[in-house]
Amino acid sequence: MKEGSFVELSEYKHLIEEMQSAVDDFRGSLDLDALNESIQENEARMAEPGFWDDQAAAQKVIDENNVLKGKYDTFKQLADEVGDLAVAYELLSEEPDAEMQAEFETDFQHAEHDLQQYRLNLLLDGPYDRNNAILEIHPGAGGTESQDWGAMLLRMYTRWAASHNFKVETVDYQAGDEAGIKSVTLLISGHNAYGYLRSEKGVHRLVRISPFDAAGRRHTSFASVDVMPELDDTVDVDIRPEDLKIDVYRASGAGGQHVNKTSSAVRITHVPTGIVVASQAQRSQLQNRQTALNMLRAKLYEREEEKKAKERAAIQGEQMDIGWGSQIRSYVFHPYTMVKDHRTNYESHHGQAVMDGDLDPFMDAYLQWKLAQRNPQ
């Protein structure tokens, strides 16, 4: 083998070390011993004589064990794959061989792909990450400026969803006074929609030269984004009819156009918490009522989960004011262009691409950040 080829091969050493480091991180976050212990406990239960007496409970144990075994086996396979690569590299370093290197490079590409896929599966392992997402945008104080910023975010998320072939349904839409929106609620349907979009929850800050300011001054606007998983009926949320205040009104679409001429839109207020949800996307009042109730269930569930998380001191700063110092991400278009996430420090100088829906790098960085929090070094 020529010296130039060996230099090329030597570059793999650092890449393989990075792979091994990633595998070690995964091992730490998985806790293989506890995982294996849970598998053995389940298998012991499955071997008991009366295991099938309660078929529903038995199936639940089997399903849970399949998930655990899948996690364990997939990790072991990945660790072996990366280990084999390291051995192959050492052999090639000692005895260069063109045919063996070609095979090594193919194996490396496969391992790289498997590692990325495993990382994604590990990051999106929350109980509702695979669910559809309910996404709300609420502009902050600032009138037309903030309402226009809300509309820009609406376009950004719609473009992002389209790039993933996700379905977007506008559940509720309140148009701005002169431009933009006062609020909007979207149902974004697709595999892992909530898992990705939960990274977007928080306050988003815009700095730009205002198109609404004749003097061409720089303005700062804020909008909050809330994201919840769409829940099915198996998730138990206690909603008492006497706690609900239900109003009906005439639905109106973007631009103020009436969707229909009957009072089919429904707004529900949960009196004990003050949570308000609304739906005007469906054709009938009954359908809108059900959609609104589903959103209320999601919000109440989210509220309870946040309460538990705060009690465990696992979440900080979830309740934020729409204002200075509380934003998760800044979008600066003057005097320079940069979009920066303040949690992960990931940034992009391609502001227009981000506004066109190029959010995956930000979402990936957030998921990696969350994993690092679970597995501190």
Swiss-Prot record:
Gene3D superfamilies noted in UniProt: 3.30.160.20, 3.30.70.1660, Release factor (1.20.58.410)
Keyword Protein biosynthesis: yes
Keywords: Cytoplasm, Methylation, Protein biosynthesis
Superkingdom, taxonomy of origin: Bacteria
Location of the protein in the cell: Cytoplasm
SMART domains: PCRF
InterPro entries xref list: PCRF, Pep_chain_release_fac_I, Pep_chain_release_fac_I_sf, PrfB
BP terms from Gene Ontology: viral translational frameshifting
Residue ranges that the Swiss-Prot or TrEMBL entry lists as coiled coil: none
Pfam family, one: RF-1
PROSITE patterns found in the cross-reference section: RF_PROK_I (PS00745)
Post-translational modification, as annotated: Methylated by PrmC. Methylation increases the termination efficiency of RF2.
One GO MF term attached to the UniProt entry: translation release factor activity, codon specific
In-chain residues carrying the UniProt-annotated modification N5-methylglutamine: 257
More details: The gene for this protein contains a UGA in-frame termination codon after Leu-30; a naturally occurring frameshift enables complete translation of RF-2. This provides a mechanism for the protein to regulate its own production.
NCBIfam families for this protein: prfB (TIGR00020)
Protein name, per record: Peptide chain release factor 2
Organism: Lactiplantibacillus plantarum (strain ATCC BAA-793 / NCIMB 8826 / WCFS1)
